[in-house]
């Protein structure tokens, strides 16, 4: 079993266990972890969540954004036929509201509000409301509702987060990112993926600038013991001068790993790096065109 594949499976197992999505499953595959490793694995998502919940009274923001919303539980509210979930510091919930200060625009908050219509055994239906909020007053200044952004099936959305890297593509033009992380439910075919979308405030709205670029992907297949293959793709973004502003240069790195049982019974892994390539995304003055092969559909 490759190291990357094991990490994918371990992360999937933790997410499934903590979200109670793997009822009846055991932690046998991660039983060999040291206490320090387990603590680190559990603390990393906790620290990440803390960064995405730094906006104080989320309830006050929700009340201004949805004045007709009504309480529907201890940490849930209803607006029409949609359910909003307030974040909890003690649990992981990919449907909970996410909030972060926009470092590039002091005084503004970034808020992502999943609007869930239905949660089934193997699927979820819902939209995502993305807001830029005035921090002193909690008043929404820019807003965009993204239909079906929370829809999933056997490949589940495991986390929503903000990316506040300085995506500057013109004079006084700054975008922020929304990342969606996905995780598969199959043990023999582990899968994880992260997509990035960029949004720019325009008037009272938010304009999509970049749609669902796949920035990370890990996928593989193995026999649940040793033999298997994994492909890990990573894409790193850099702003570069273009004809109509700043283009995006995407550095793509791919690593292929193969694992086989050796004659001595040990599991042997071979990693092979594919030659990196660079993909240029041109800015047309309003948005970037993403090739279909590197975009989630």
PLM regions: where:
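N-terminal signal peptide c-region/cleavage motif recognized by signal peptidases
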Residues: 43-45
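Short N-terminal edge-element motif at the start of the domain
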Residues: 107-170
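Acidic, small-residue rich beta-repeat scaffolds with periodic aromatic anchors
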Residues: 49-85, 189-207, 211-297
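Structural signature of eukaryotic scaffold interfaces centered on beta-propeller domains
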Residues: 95-105, 158-171, 237-244
